[in-house]
Design a protein with these regions (language model features):
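Short juxta-domain linker segments that transition from a proline/glycine-rich
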Residues: 2-5, 12-15, 26, 30, ...
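Short, conserved structural micro-motifs that define repeat-unit consensus positions
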Residues: 7-10, 20-21
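Residues within helix-turn-helix
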Residues: 22, 33
Length: 420
């Protein structure tokens, strides 16, 4: 059995909890010297100590996995293309603060603040795309609403009773899905929205009104004002998704249906994209779903949404890999396309992808089209209905990469230009 060292993770946990080694050792029921050896990677992490850590601090065992470090190592490889992978992995594992500093260097050298959208993306990634207090608050909010047929009127009643906001349905045909006016004390919803979309929009505004302090508490560490504003918006959307698809219910549905996205979507009235994105956030300690990668892209390969609870690394420059199944999804509208792929580091993933369309538009105008993909490590694939009939062995997997500019597969027939 491979020995697993988690010194950096244990040290980070202890620092976040504000504990000395003596305090933490006492909580875990181990000696201070043993904890010191664990933190300095002089001793491997045993199953017994792992269980103690997860139980005492309410963590899932995946917190101590190497997935996060492998993803960071991939990001460092883009900035330091000549550095050995083993050394980058060591930096990501042993010196996370140094790794973050290296990642921040391009923006610092440019003398300008980082792109606020990238700041927010990294913010969600650092939280493993899961916010426990928001998720549980959303579940508590959704539970009394009961059946889907009644939840819209009940949310509207809560907004009116508790905050004096009137909900006006089918108020406009274009623009944003919803708008709130604090002066008029009303929330206006665009026409043509599905029941689940209306539930999402009302829950979004409820989060901003009822849980503003909680949103601020999460977003306050972000220095960039624009990024902080975007993070607050994203956190309210997170709450809305969690209220529309409550954690316990969607996890139960996912396990029961073997993660059949269409069946789950039918239960909650949600679209394929929304369901996939919510599945990618189910990382509650003690009740985790499969760790997923979620991505949305257009025909040109521009990634407009991305989140990962795995080691999968997205390239920060250039396009996406042309051999990736997400591009084939545009060829088969309204059908799920599957792929087993292997990355240059040897990790094998199973992917499901599908084209999704925006709302209907007038004749002659282009309709928004994207492809969304949901992927997981092949080790979890047999838990999904999409693995049935697929050969999951690495030998039969399609070799893909992070993108041509940083991909080490020099002999790839689809390479668009040489690697940096």
């Amino acid at each position: 059995m491979t020995k697993h060292y988690a010194g950096a993770r244990i040290h980070t946990l202890r620092a976040n909890e504000g504990l000395t080694q003596v305090d933490m050792a006492r909580k875990l029921g181990i000696s201070t010297s043993y904890l010191n050896q664990l933190e300095n990677d002089q001793r491997p992490l045993t199953v017994t100590v792992l269980l103690q850590l997860t139980q005492v601090f309410g963590l899932d065992a995946t917190f101590f996995s190497a997935d996060a470090e492998q993803r960071v190592a991939g990001e460092l490889a883009e900035l330091l293309p000549g550095a050995p992978e083993s050394e980058l992995a060591e930096i990501a594992l042993r010196y996370p603060a140094v790794a973050q500093g290296i990642k921040d260097l391009p923006g610092m050298l440019a003398g300008a603040a980082s792109n606020p959208h990238i700041v927010v993306r990294d913010f969600f990634q650092q939280h493993n795309n899961y916010f426990h207090d928001l998720d549980t608050a959303a579940e508590d909010f959704a539970t009394p609403l009961h059946a889907r047929q009644l939840r819209l009127t009940r949310i509207a009643a809560v907004l009116d009773r508790d905050f004096g906001y009137t909900v006006r349905f089918n108020q406009h045909t274009g623009g944003e899905r919803s708008a709130a006016s604090a002066d008029a004390r009303e929330i206006r919803l665009r026409t043509g929205l599905s029941e689940a979309q209306q539930c999402f929009e009302l829950s979004y505004h409820y989060a901003r009104i009822a849980h503003g302090q909680l949103l601020d508490a999460h977003a306050s560490p972000i220095a960039n004002p624009r990024a902080r504003q975007l993070a607050r918006h994203g956190l309210a959307q997170y709450f809305a998704a969690a209220a529309t698809m409550p954690y316990s219910l969607i996890l139960e549905a996912a396990e029961e249906t073997r993660y059949d996205v269409d069946v789950i979507s039918a239960r909650f009235g949600t679209g394929f994209e929304s369901t996939c994105q919510r599945l990618g956030t189910l990382q509650r300690p003690g009740a985790t779903a499969i760790p997923f990668v979620f991505v949305r892209t257009d025909r040109a390969g521009n990634i407009s949404k991305r989140q990962s609870t795995t080691s999968f690394h997205f390239s920060q420059r250039g396009g996406t890999c042309p051999l990736w199944v997400v591009h084939r999804a545009f060829e088969t509208s309204n059908r799920v396309t599957r792929q087993v792929s292997v990355m240059p580091d040897g990790r094998t993933y199973m992917w499901v992808a599908r084209m999704v369309q925006g709302p209907a538009v007038e004749f002659g105008k282009p309709r928004k089209e994207n492809a969304v993909a949901l992927g997981c490590d092949a080790a979890h694939a047999d838990r999904m209905v999409y693995a049935d009939g697929l050969d999951l062995s690495p030998d039969s997997a399609t070799p893909i990469g992070p993108g041509c500019e940083t991909c080490p597969r020099r002999a790839c027939p689809q390479r668009a230009f040489p690697a940096l």
